[in-house]
Amino acid sequence: MSKKDSLLTTPYLQFNRTQWAALRDSVPMTLSEAEIAQLKGINEDLSIEEVAEIYLPLSRLLNFYISSNLRRQAVLEQFLGTNGQKIPYIISIAGSVAVGKSTTARVLQALLSRWPEHRRVELITTDGFLHPNAVLKERGLMKKKGFPLSYDMHRLVKFVSDLKSGADHVTAPVYSHLIYDVIPDGDKNVQQPDILILEGLNVLQSGMDYPHDPHHVFVSDFVDFSIYVDAPEDLLEHWYINRFLKFRQGAFTDPDSYFHHYAQLPEDEAVGIASQLWHEINYRNLKENILPTRERASLIMTKSSGHAVDLVRLRK
């Protein structure tokens, strides 16, 4: 098969960094360098160039899709002769642990809320929908946090279903990385946002990923646009270990941290533990449950060293 034929048979349009950056068109930069610094994760160098060349074109594309969706809703209301309920546009962001999903989500939230329409953008992570530690311990699943079995999928599906049904307000549980658990009675109220960004490991999964739990609808059924943040496996491992070491010098030093006992470890021992955690838990979850969902995404962003995106694939 020729290169031309292979490009024609893929469901994705492919853009290198320069090609994608050109699609920004004339969209203005609405974030200052100080604001960008606040949005980046502990393990990332998020530059103003990265926002301009990768995230501004993406926010422009999403604004087109969202506007089109609103026009479609208006057509339906005109046909029915009703003033319809406010239905949020849902964007999901999936990918491995340590790939930078949270930073992508925060940057998109900031950019989309600054478009002239001043849309209200909520950000929810699916970590809150993990079963509490007490339940995971009872079921012997503490070493499988993030695997399909560790989530309260019924509650997560009900959350997105209620939003898509026009509910006035819904609640989402909140996860604390400090205590490594869902916060008891710490639910967040979500009141009819224009856009919901849902970030998590499992947001592209479907019935094929839950043979043990045969329910009929999934988060992906309610998502309007899905993003998969991708990177080579060796970089993911490097970023995971590096993040662990930074936490060891920062968050883990808090006496209330679930991982406080790691704070005093010598660096070589900490690297060994981080590597073990990566291979035994996070790499397994990536290979078995996360990576197989990549080709379901509307858009795939592939990162290289320094967390810089160098390839974007957009579903035709």
Swiss-Prot record:
Xref: Pfam families: PRK
GO biological process assignments: coenzyme A biosynthetic process
InterPro entries: P-loop_NTPase (IPR027417), PanK (IPR004566), PRK/URK (IPR006083)
Pathway(s) of this molecule: Cofactor biosynthesis; coenzyme A biosynthesis; CoA from (R)-pantothenate: step 1/5
Amino-acid positions noted as binding ATP in the UniProt annotation, renumbered to this chain: 95-102
Family the UniProt entry places it in: Belongs to the prokaryotic pantothenate kinase family.
Name of the protein: Pantothenate kinase
Keywords, comma-separated and alphabetical: ATP-binding, Coenzyme A biosynthesis, Cytoplasm, Kinase, Nucleotide-binding, Transferase
Entry's EC annotation: 2.7.1.33
SUPFAM superfamilies for the chain: P-loop containing nucleoside triphosphate hydrolases (SSF52540)
Catalytic activity, as annotated: (R)-pantothenate + ATP = (R)-4'-phosphopantothenate + ADP + H(+)
Species for this entry: Erwinia tasmaniensis (strain DSM 17950 / CFBP 7177 / CIP 109463 / NCPPB 4357 / Et1/99)
Gene from which this protein is expressed: coaA
Record flagged with keyword Nucleotide-binding: yes
Uppermost EC category: transferase
